[in-house]
Structures are given as structure tokens and as C-alpha cells.
Amino acid sequence: MGCWGQLLVWFGAAGAILCSSPGSQETFLRSSPLPLASPSPRDPKVSAPPSILEPASPLNSPGTEGSWLFSTCGASGRHGPTQTQCDGAYAGTSVVVTVGAAGQLRGVQLWRVPGPGQYLISAYGAAGGKGAKNHLSRAHGVFVSAIFSLGLGESLYILVGQQGEDACPGGSPESQLVCLGESRAVEEHAAMDGSEGVPGSRRWAGGGGGGGGATYVFRVRAGELEPLLVAAGGGGRAYLRPRDRGRTQASPEKLENRSEAPGSGGRGGAAGGGGGWTSRAPSPQAGRSLQEGAEGGQGCSEAWATLGWAAAGGFGGGGGACTAGGGGGGYRGGDASETDNLWADGEDGVSFIHPSSELFLQPLAVTENHGEVEIRRHLNCSHCPLRDCQWQAELQLAECLCPEGMELAVDNVTCMDLHKPPGPLVLMVAVVATSTLSLLMVCGVLILVKQKKWQGLQEMRLPSPELELSKLRTSAIRTAPNPYYCQVGLGPAQSWPLPPGVTEVSPANVTLLRALGHGAFGEVYEGLVIGLPGDSSPLQVAIKTLPELCSPQDELDFLMEALIISKFRHQNIVRCVGLSLRATPRLILLELMSGGDMKSFLRHSRPHLGQPSPLVMRDLLQLAQDIAQGCHYLEENHFIHRDIAARNCLLSCAGPSRVAKIGDFGMARDIYRASYYRRGDRALLPVKWMPPEAFLEGIFTSKTDSWSFGVLLWEIFSLGYMPYPGRTNQEVLDFVVGGGRMDPPRGCPGPVYRIMTQCWQHEPELRPSFASILERLQYCTQDPDVLNSLLPMELGPTPEEEGTSGLGNRSLECLRPPQPQELSPEKLKSWGGSPLGPWLSSGLKPLKSRGLQPQNLWNPTYRS
């Protein structure tokens, strides 16, 4: 190929000739290093000896941190950044690059590897532009990440993709009216012509968004460009929202890992397809390939000539828009519509990972604006005791981390106890002895004083669950009538009708064992019930009660919860054993879930140094499947739970045969209160588990529970951590509305995190149903890579050291139900008890002395 002008450029000791043709865009790069701008004597980063021109990116000093972030340097649109822009953007950081000034690599950033080793390279493609009336969301750019072995001084070429341009605000008054929603000129012209996108009726052309540019990371090998990573750009949105958007799932991200695969460009029509690795642009609207300069395609000429639309593709091969959206750039460019109709979005490009790399994470569409590249050292910590280490820039090595109270030995592997210099032993003994004697004297005086007041203080004790249980057993308190509260113990109680199909339990058949804690209405007890149909043996249950003094609203809420709980019959929803609503005290009897709530169980099961977790990845997947089964049942019965969270899920036991069940319907009950939808009443809204449409507009559908289930998955695989760590509810609201999503928990398998991200789609229609979630969880249980994943080691103190209550011997096996010969009705009668005051007429019997002391077995999920 002939050249009109030739430019000779040298990089160090390696030289090559770059052949450029100003009048043609069909010149391809064969063996050309990055063309540089002329060095400036005022720029300290550039030095130019008489015969050799060095790049402006010297090797990083030994003190440089092992993480580098590359951006668009503030550039946007079709063209890449300049050297001046990148110098300003990277000022004050460890990133030093050389930016191409001309030719096919104009806008490409050159960076040199500071030292040999393995590097984790993460690339983010740019998002596509929004359409004039399709602006609720944009097509996300794709994220890819892999590990590469790089040598000292090796040159990496980095092209950071730029976001495709939006159609609005438009370039003419008429187009601006369309953007504001005050004009339907495009739709009216389409209706009159009857063409809806057929070429020839171009008066209404334009209004689509440009395709997003791809992000490329490549190097030169044997005189040829070799791609390492290509993160595809998102396709541009069309003028109108697609008609079938609500009935189709989002297309999966595409990945290519064959070096010999062709890097072709996307097909297009009036809107251009995305540029590929080696393609040739067939039209001005098509995005240029990397070897053509990777410029974004122009907007179609008809759009500019009529309504002033000019939505170009982003730098990185994004296709220009017309009425349809442009295709996204990539290793292979995304296609654009050939008919240019009103609702044809551009397709995303195809990502690429070199086969010589170690795949770190499957591609995922996450980027909502410009692309970026992050490079960090990949540390090999397999030799460390905790399998964890950190990079020491001064020593240029990975230093192992040791537990608290220990230090690293000289061999950089062994952890040993900290050396504590011995103190003056005699003085220490004297101080301890004196302090002990003084403390004993003070305690003796206090004991003598307190003994005189002990009887009075016993009468003034604050109410507690155990005190309330004692009062129910012995008290005969009578209350005066108050019109604002229901009467307790005065006259006959109002009879409430029972729902059909629910077992009515007489209070005479209920025995209280011990208090579990406080609920939303009153106390919750562990107890025994006899006389159930078809079962003569006593059954352990959890008993919800209504307090002595209650308002009419409390009575209605209690009845509503009873109706909701008794409605469901499923193995993964806590079963309602029976109700007692015809006389006071009102009772709801639930099956006793001895394993406690899921959140506390997960926190207690975290692995610690010297204390492995009793759980494996299959156990976590089983917990998720159990709750998904319950949610699927609710979804099929058109019931919206509104508060799927780990704290509201209970375990039948803590052993291997555990079954997880949904155990709280408080949010579902509260929606029937008139005050529920008042703006600003955030106390009733669990913001961290709710999608944007729920806390912004008060819209609840089955897709609301899908979002909450994604957060529950995050809780399960983080072993009980609070979602959105370190953020307040208001910060979470702003973060989610702004498009932010949580990162995967440490050690979470990629397929499981993909289920979370699908549940967190901004558009409710794009979130999967629970039938689809169950299918994807089943795939995970059949994936050896997922099942063999290890739980991350916890470096902090164990729950016992933190003072939290553990599960004790409950973690070894399920609680066995009482045997009939141990708890026969005759023995229950022999236990006896004193009169129960207001409970006397109902015949409710407490369990007398069995040595049962108050224990913190209360689960907050038992509350409403």
C-alpha cells in the first residue's frame, strides 16, 4: 500500500514505520507503535534526545501502589482524549500514559508495566445513548476481568470506550419539543406515511441514541496487535421504547475467546453498526474498528438535515444513530436495525478475553456511562497461613497478614506471638492486690445497703417477658373500663369468627413453658398444646398473645395477622397450628422453629481461624432454594410479601436437616392500615430490601419480592452481613435510585451473583420470576465450580468473643419433639398451677417448676 506521507517513530530500542494516508480511512495498522505528539520542553514527563523519542510513561517507581485506574480523561463523543487532557486527569496519581496524537491509534493510551508478575485487568465498556422518548434506561456497557502475566517494561495499549450520545436535547426547536414530550411529529409522520421505518419516508428521521464504545486492552506481539481484553459497549436506544420490552428477557452478554475468530463489524442501515477489531466501516454512520481509528459513527444525515438530531456513537467503535439506535462497539460490533423503525434498539457488541488468560469473572452488563480500565497486581497468597496478603511497594513483594496479637516472622510466612517485655512483677502484684481488696470492701458495703431495699426494689422491677409470664400465672388484676382500650376480664369477651379450614384451639389445652420475648402485640411464649385433631400427643408450639390492654386497632391488626398466617399451607412457610379468637386471651399458635432466625444462624456459622464453618456452599444454596420455594408459592397465589429478608426467615433446626421457612408477614399486614402510604413515614419501609419503585411511588408487585430475594441472596452468601455496609437508609435510597448496585460478597460464585444482579434490574419487568430463580439455583447446585467454592475466612472475633448469643448445642442436631410417654395429658394435669386471674375462665395452664430459666431464645421474626 502506498503512503502520501510517512512518519518514523521510535520507542526505546524498538522502531517501526507508521504509514498514514490523510485521504483514506482504509489504512490498517500492521506493525506500528503509538504515534506521539511532539515533546514540549515545559512537560517534565517527556524527554526527547536528538535521535530517540521516548514515551511519556516511564516505569513506575518502587513506591508506586499496585493499582492503576484509566479513564476517558474527560473526553466524550466520537473522538478520544488528547495528551493534555490525560495529563490533567491523572495529575496527582501514579498513572502516567502517552496518548496517541495521530493515525489509527489517536486517543489510545500507552502504559508500561512497572514490574514482572501477574496483573488483574478489569475493563468496562461504555453505555449506549438514550432515545428521545426511550430515556428511562440506557443499555449498559459490559464488564470483563481476567488475570495476565506481564513482564517488566512491557507496553500495554488502552483504549477507553466513551458513552454513545443521547438524542436529547436535540439540535433544533422542533426536536427539543419532541424531547420535552410536547410534540409527536415523528409518530404523526410515521402514521401518515404508513411506513414506520421503511426507507423513503425520511422527514421524521432521527431521535435514536448512539452506540457505546468498546474498551480495548491490547499489546504488540511479533509486529501484530494482540487483544487481551475487549469490553463491549452497549447498544443505543431507539426513538421509542420497544413494544415487547415487558414480555422478553434481556439478552445475555456475548463473549468470544478464540484468537482466530474474525473481529467483524455489526450490520446496519440508516443507523450504523458497531465497529469490531479488524472490520471496515461501510458507511459514515458505522463505528470504526480499532485498526481504523475506533472513532464513533456519525448520526444519519437525514436526521441532521430535518430535525437536527446528531447522536453519534462513542469513541471505541460505537455506531451512529438514526431513528433506530446505533450498535455497540466490541471485538465484533453490535448490529443496528436495517429498516430503521421507531423502536429498534441497537445491539450490544461482543466481548473478548484472550485464551492465555485466567478467566476471573464472566461478562456482566453494569456500566451506565463512560468506560474505564483498572489494573492491579494479583497477589499469590497461597503460602500464607490465612491465605491473605497485601502488597508492600517499598519491598516489592506480597507480605502475609497475621491474626490480631501476632506478628510476621522474618521468613514472611510464619506468624508468631508478639514479644511483650516483662514488667516489674512485684509492683504489678501489689497493685492488683490493693485493687482487689478495695473492690471487695466497696462491694460489701453496697451489698449491705442493697439488702435493706431489696424487697422494695422487687416490687419496682421493670416488666420483662418472664415477669409477664409470672403475672399470667398468678395475677387477679381487674381493670377499670376505658373507652380507648379493649376490656380485659370485665364481662364476656367478644367472639371473633374463625377463618374456614383453621383449627380452633381451646385455651384449656394450652400450657405455657417459658417466655421467648416481645412481639408487636404482646408476649410470645414457648408452650405445649394437646387435643389437636388426629394427634393425641403434646406438640411444642410458639404462642403469640394479645396484651391485657389493647386498642381496637391492635385487635384488628392481630385478627388480620391471624387471617394471613392461617391462609397458607406450604412446607417452606411457617405453619399455623391453630387459633383461639373466641375468648380472651387471643392466641395464635405457630409451629416452633428451634433453629432461630436465618440471619443469626448465618452470623454464628462464619468460619474463623481454628473454627471451621459447619456450612458448605451446598448448604447456602439449599437455604436459598427453600425460601425461593416459599416465595414461588406466594407468587402463584398472587400474594406479595413485601419484606423478604434473612431476619424474617426461620430454621426448623440448626443441624444438617434444617429447613428454611418464611415466618413473618408484618409488612403484608400493615398495608391494610390507612397510614401506610403516607409520604415520609419511613419507619414502615425496609429501604435496604426494597426496589426503587416501591419506596418512590409505593408500587408493590411480585417483582418487588424478586428484588428483595436478591438482597436475601446477598445476605446468605455474605453469611449474615448487613446489606449496603456503612450506608444509611437515605444513602441507600440515593445509591439505588442513581443506578448503583452492591458488589458480590467475598467468595461468592459468579453464577450466584448473576442471579442477584438479575433480581436488581431497574425495570421490574426484567426481573425473573421465582420459577426462573428456582431453575437458576438448580443449575448452581449442579455446577462443580460453585459447589467447590470455599467460604471466606473471617479475621474478626468469633460470635462468642463479641458477646453474641450462640446456638450452643442446637447447632449439633435438631430439637427432638417430646415423646408421648414423657408428656402425656395425665402428666400435664399433674403439673397443676395456681389460678391465673383473667386467664381463669379460659383454662390456660402454665407449666410449674421444671428448672426452666429465662433464655434468650427469642427470635425477632416472631413479631408481626
Swiss-Prot record:
GO terms for molecular function: ATP binding; protein kinase activity; protein tyrosine kinase activity; receptor signaling protein tyrosine kinase activator activity; transmembrane receptor protein tyrosine kinase activity. Residues 263-277 have a biased composition (Gly residues). The modification Phosphotyrosine is found at Y676. Expressed in non-hematopoietic cell lines and T- and B-cell lines. Residues 450-864 are cytoplasmic. Residues 852-864 have a biased composition (Polar residues). It is found in: Cell membrane. GO terms for biological process: cell population proliferation; cell surface receptor protein tyrosine kinase signaling pathway; cellular response to retinoic acid; negative regulation of apoptotic process; peptidyl-tyrosine autophosphorylation; positive regulation of cardiac muscle cell apoptotic process; positive regulation of neuron projection development; positive regulation of phosphatidylinositol 3-kinase/protein kinase B signal transduction. It catalyses: L-tyrosyl-[protein] + ATP = O-phospho-L-tyrosyl-[protein] + ADP + H(+). The active site is at D643 (proton acceptor). Residues 510-786 form the Protein kinase domain. One of its GO terms (cellular component) is receptor complex. It is an enzyme of class 2 (transferase). The keyword Kinase applies. Residues 1-16 form the signal peptide. Its EC number is 2.7.10.1. Homodimer; homodimerizes following ligand-binding. Part of a complex including LTK, TNK2 and GRB2, in which GRB2 promotes LTK recruitment by TNK2. This is Leukocyte tyrosine kinase receptor. The lineage of its organism: Eukaryota, Metazoa, Chordata, Craniata, Vertebrata. The gene is LTK.
